[in-house]
Amino acid sequence: MNHQKSTTSGDDETDYFDAIHVDLFTAKILSKLPVKSIAQCRCVSKLWSSQIRRPYYNMLFPIMSPAPPRILFTIENAEGLFFYTSPQPRNPDENTSLVATLHHRTSGNSLLITSPPVGGLLCLEHDRKNYSRVLVISNPITGEFLALPKLRINEIKKELLYLNETYIFGYDPIDKQSKDAERHQWSKHIYQLPNRYLNKVVAAGVVGSSEIVFYRKYTREQDQFFIAYYNLESNIITRVILEVPLLFSGTCCVNAFTNYVGDVRLM
C-alpha cells in the first residue's frame, strides 16, 4: 500500500492512503458464503457480478467451507421439470431419512436429460414444435439456461432420419493437463441384486468406493420416494426414505446423479 502526504494551508499534515482494492474485500466476503448465496450476490452490483464471472474465480478465491457433494434429482411430469438436491450420506442405515431441496422448475415437458452433470452444469435436449432439436446447458442451482447454436438445415434433416444419435456433454478446463485414460487398469466384477430390485431401479452413481445408489425411474404422487444404497462389500441393500416437496401430481420421470457439486459462475 502506498503512503502519501499532503500539506494544507494551515501547514497541518494529513495522511492519505490509496484506496484499498475493493475487489479483495468483495472476494473475502464471497468466500464465506454458501454456493447458492454467492449466486444471489451477482445481483448486488456490477462489481460483484464481474468477480463471480471470472473463469478462474474458484481458484483465485476458493470457498472457505465448500458444501459436501449432494445427490441431484430431476423430476419431470406434465407440469414441468423440477430440480432438487439432497444430502449424500455414506453408510446409511434403515433409520436414515433425507430431505430434498427444490431449487427451481421449468414449464413444459419437452426437455430431456442427455448426460450426467459436468462442472455443475447439465446438458438438456429441447424438442421444438417444428421437430427440430436444440441443446441447452442448464445450471440446476442458479436456474440459468443457455441454448447452444442452432443446427443448420441439413443437420436437422439428418437428425430426423437418424433419431438414435447421442449427445455427449464434455468440459474442457482451461490450462489443465489431462491424463491418458488408456493407462488406467480396469477390472470387472459382477454383483447380483435381489430379484425385487432388478427391474425397478437404475443406478445414480457411486458414493465412496463401495456403495452404489439406486433410484426408481418412474414414480407416482402417492408412492413413497426412496433411494437404495447397495454396499458392494457387504452385499446389503439399505433403503433410505427421501422427503421430496411435491409440487406436481401424476406419474413422474426421475433422473438422479451422485457427487453433484454446484457452480455459481455465469454461463
Swiss-Prot record:
SUPFAM superfamilies assigned to the protein according to its UniProt record, in alphabetical order: F-box domain
InterPro entries in UniProt: F-box-like_dom_sf (IPR036047), F-box_dom (IPR001810)
Protein name: Putative F-box protein At1g61060
Chain ranges of the F-box domain: 15-63
Disulfide pattern: none
Entry superkingdom: Eukaryota
A Pfam family it matches: F-box
